[in-house]
Amino acid sequence: MWQAKDTVGYRNSLDMYERAFSLFPDSIDEDGLYRVSVLASGLKEYDKAFKYLTLLFELKPNLPWAPNWSYILGEDSENEYKNLLSDVRWNDLRQKALKAKQTFYEELNVNEKEFYAVDEVSLCKVKDGKALYGEFRKKFGYLPKKSQNYSVSFAINDSIKTSFFVHLPKDYNPNKSYPLLFFLHGAVRYNQLSDYQLASWVLYDWNRYYTKYAERNEVILVFPKGSRKFNWMTSDDGFFMIPKIVALVKKTLNVDDDKVFISGHSNGATGAFSYLMKQPSLFAGFYGFNTYPKVFTGGTFVENIKNRSFINFSTDKDYYYPPNANDDFTQLMNSINADYKEFRYNGFSHSFPQFDESEPAYGILFSDLLKRQRNPFPKEISWEFDDECYGNIDWLSNIKLDTLAVRKDWHKVKNFKINRWLKYDEKDSLVVMEVDRMAFDFPRKSGKIVAKYENNIFRIETSCVKSFSVNISPEMIDMGKKVRIYLNGNLCFDKRIGYDTDFMLQNFNTTRDKIQIWINQIHIQEGQGVPYSCKSKKQMATY
């Protein structure tokens, strides 16, 4: 129970609530009934406790803050209502709550099945590659949705699951493609996985402007739920979640593949930045509120931003990442001609989205989102990585490290020093702290690849890279002509490329991308001493 100096304080609180209920009966809500029922239980006012607890259980608000059964079956319930446990009325309520919980989960399952319902035709029997490519490009199988909001379960592994929440445009039309925006929550170290989410948890309060502008501009919103172990910032254990959820959503909703975006606040903004650094291919653009622009699971290779874009909404009183560091980071971004913008809002702390003054930032975000599109087949790519799980970027994939190789002269580290940080002192005042730290850590050796193509000719330079694959699309080459690949100035592949239907199906089932479709793959491996060789259905070259 909430702390008071003595029983008199609890009694006064109970009396205050009851007077308010009497004066304003139309304003009785979940929070009030919950608090007064706990107070009455603590004061051993059994009849009042059961009266208000029953009203709480039977309340049907338009926007519930918790399922009604959770107040009775929650992990804290037996402690909060410990004085009621021996009363037969508690057991009666508990039995009703158990039935309500069962019904709640049954309805979740029904809604989830309806969410995933599609009228999809199997493509496994299509053996002609060109025809299969045409089928992939179609917007097929999508159905209308009965609801605007869906809480969808998500299996992390065989024994652990969480959820993601989907908010659709009001008049969602399955024949129309929509932009998709992910929001990553912060405070990942203090969050827990949840097998369901409610609209009241994600669409309002600090997220109210996401909801407002998404509804105004017909953007699909997705809110995943992470935890200390499974998240998008501090651990790679949960980094797979967002790409997997993208594929699941694309399977059932008509998403514009070139307009998938990701945003977040605090740890969530750092998560959005991490996908930009490590796994950007699915996305068109990245945004962050109060961002700490650093990869916490490995090196931060800032030139990777040149493959996409980032907009950072910062404040000058942020303990999470100080304004002087943001200034230096912006200067670094400008020096490499990155598509990066920072908008500084002075006078605000780390909790910037809490304030109404943050609304213009969301206007900027959605204005950019509406104009921006992914280039699925960029003419040039620059990619650096230190973990082979993230050796993929657009039409380059399966990039493997050569940790014994000597770094090329053009393969340079970019970093800067941070000398000042903001922190709260014992009086809860924000003060400047002198520090001596580098902006980024580099715990492992990295590899880098720079590639470009034009007129069926690919020119690729590598540093500390052992092998890689070049993904091929008919949008990139003339299928009637040979493809030539020059690796570090030497011709290593010179052949025509055909369609590989098995590879096409496997890749499509993984990404559900109807635009960035690969019809074959050329594998390049250094150091074999022969011009090239072919292996299986995939084209393989060794140099």
Segments and roles (model prediction):
Residues 2-18:
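Helix-turn-helix repeat elements of alpha-solenoid scaffolds
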Residues 8, 12, 43, 95-125, ...:
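Alpha/beta-hydrolase-fold serine-hydrolase catalytic core, especially in secreted/extracellular enzymes
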Residues 30-43, 64-96:
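TPR/TPR-like alpha-solenoid helical repeat scaffolds
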Residues 85, 89-178, 496-508:
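A domain-start/cap signature at the N-terminus of enzymes
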Residues 170-176, 230-266:
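Gly/Ser-rich "nucleophile elbow"/oxyanion-hole loop immediately N-terminal to the catalytic nucleophile
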Residues 176-189:
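Short beta-strand element of the alpha/beta-hydrolase
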Residues 250-252, 257-306:
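Primarily recognizes the serine-hydrolase "nucleophile elbow" in alpha/beta-hydrolase
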Residues 285, 290-370:
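The feature captures the conserved acid-bearing segment of alpha/beta-hydrolase catalytic domains
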